[in-house]
A protein has these predicted regions:
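A glycine- and small-residue-enriched flexible loop/hinge signal that marks low-structured segments
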Residues: 1-256, 260, 265, 275-277
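C-terminal structured domain segments
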Residues: 257-298
Length: 323
């Protein structure tokens, strides 16, 4: 409540009425008209009560408020609210294992529905999914502020959501940070990475993300260790989401499910993949790697797409010869 300000000003269109504006951290979140306090309706930030006429004020800063207790149901409601919207990354800054489990189940269900998004949590490597990122430690800012692992989720979420499809966040610097809150030895760092844990380390006096990875670690012959790298995953997500958008925008309900119609869709898919190759997200794109055939139903189409993602250079093996 301490970040809420209420501004009351005269309404120029309706004489005698006032505009009551609720501001949160400097942003307008609610606006309504009224003559008296009784005319006002409560909103998500302020519960208006009382009687009497309204009076102008440049800004009444509310005091004594608190955030209240966040319940598991609040997180469940949040996930239900955002599900209908398109998004690429969400972060849940909590240490509660039960909430992490609920969020992970939610993200995995979206994956089963064909939506490829990523979730950022702290210390939850057991998710074992390319759709879930787990952050192990936090950072210390130059003014001494401690950003713990649950709070640093916000930075990782922003960095992940803002990364280009052909960009890795490995060694991405945390602006303003001078140290990490928990230091690890090289062996401990290696073990954490193998366990699917993203962490911060200090390199050349910079606090950086040691490696841009997710929690996937149950490798198989069909799904290898490349899936643990977030740049590779972003590329695969872009292929999935981009082709889906292409289909929904230009073909579903519009194109004929004939040889010519499917070939037209195939050509557009190839063009899309070639664009990704042009920005060095993919390599070796050839038409033979894209197959579009008629499905079992008369209105269904089956697409098979083979791609080769390009990862960033992260490992250097060097031999120095002395002569």
């Amino acid at each position: 409540g301490n970040n809420i300000t209420v501004v009351i000003q005269n309404n120029i269109d309706v004489p005698g009425n006032f505009e009551v504006i609720t501001m949160f951290e400097g942003n307008k979140v609610d606006k309504q008209l009224g003559k008296t306090i009784a005319d006002l309706k409560s909103n998500s930030y302020v519960d208006f009560k009382g009687t009497g006429d309204l009076k102008t004020t440049a800004g009444l800063v509310l005091k004594g408020g608190d955030d209240g207790a966040v319940t598991n149901q609040a997180y469940t409601d949040y996930l239900g609210t955002i599900e209908p919207y398109e998004f690429h990354t969400i972060g849940i800054p909590t240490k509660d294992a039960s909430i992490k489990a609920v969020a992970t189940t939610f993200i995995k269900r979206l994956k089963e529905d064909g939506r490829q998004v990523q979730l950022v949590l702290e210390n939850y490597p057991e998710a074992d999914s390319e759709n879930v990122i787990s952050v192990k430690n936090g950072v210390v800012l130059s003014d001494g502020t401690l950003i713990t692992s649950d709070k640093v989720v916000a930075f990782i979420t922003g960095a992940t959501a803002g990364a280009n499809v052909n960009q890795s966040n490995t060694y991405l610097e945390y602006p303003g940070a001078i140290d990490v809150d928990k230091k690890y030895t090289n062996r401990e760092i290696e073990e954490a990475l193998l366990n699917g844990e993203m962490l911060f380390s200090v390199s050349n006096n910079r606090v950086v993300i040691e490696q841009d990875i997710n929690t996937f670690k149950s490798f198989t012959s069909d799904k290898g260790k490349d899936y643990r790298k977030n740049r590779v995953v972003r590329i695969l997500f872009e292929v999935n989401n981009g082709i889906r958008l292409l289909w929904e925008t230009n073909y579903i309900g519009k194109g004929d499910n004939s040889v010519d119609g499917r070939n037209l869709f195939k050509k557009d898919v190839i063009k899309f993949l070639e664009k990704l190759q042009g920005i060095e997200a993919l390599e070796n794109v050839i038409p033979e790697d894209v197959e579009v055939i008629k499905g079992t139903d008369k209105d269904s189409v089956v697409a098979r797409v083979e791609v080769q993602p390009i990862d960033a250079m992260e490992k250097l093996y060097m031999t120095v010869e002395v002569r």
